[in-house]
From Swiss-Prot:
The keyword rRNA processing does not apply. This is Uncharacterized protein ycf35. The lineage of its organism: Eukaryota, Sar, Stramenopiles, Ochrophyta, Bacillariophyta. It is found in: Plastid, Chloroplast. InterPro entries: Uncharacterised_Ycf35. The keyword Iron-sulfur does not apply. Pfam families: DUF1257. Belongs to the ycf35 family. It comes from Trieres chinensis (Marine centric diatom). Keywords: Chloroplast, Plastid. GO terms for cellular component: chloroplast. The gene is ycf35.
């Protein structure tokens, strides 16, 4: 039996979410409309969809505040657990936001490194 779960995230910017997914080599498709889930009719705007081999796709849907992850947890087929999957995307998303927004205010990243603990460090310089 299918059970779709909505998982709250803090992903609020589609551009940076797509950049994070691309950097993590997570294939996704933009914009789709779904009208039938679990034999119930819904009108849901899906902003990003990640296909899975079993046909139970993962979706990021805008709820008015953030992109929620919607997935059937019974048919999860990613290499990481749901929590690990979201954490990996969140870490990459945060880095993309920091770099992108820093560039907007005149900073340029000059060095990016991954630390032993799995965190990332980015060094910036000002553009003059």
């Amino acid at each position: 039996m299918s059970h779709f779960t909505n998982i709250e995230t803090r992903f609020q910017n589609l551009f940076y979410l797509e950049k994070a997914l691309n950097k993590l080599d997570i294939n996704h498709k933009p914009q789709k409309k779904v009208t039938n889930i679990n034999s119930k009719s819904y009108d849901i705007d899906i902003n990003l969809m990640i296909s899975q081999p079993n046909g139970y796709d993962i979706e990021f849907c805008w709820n008015g505040q953030e992109y929620e992850l919607i997935a059937d947890t019974s048919f999860w087929q990613q290499k990481d657990s749901i929590k690990g999957f979201i954490n990996n995307i969140a870490k990459q998303y945060a880095g993309e936001v920091i770099i992108g927004e820093s560039k907007k205010i005149g900073f340029q990243p000059i060095k990016y490194q991954q630390n032993k603990d799995g965190s990332n460090t980015c060094y910036f310089t000002t553009l003059e």
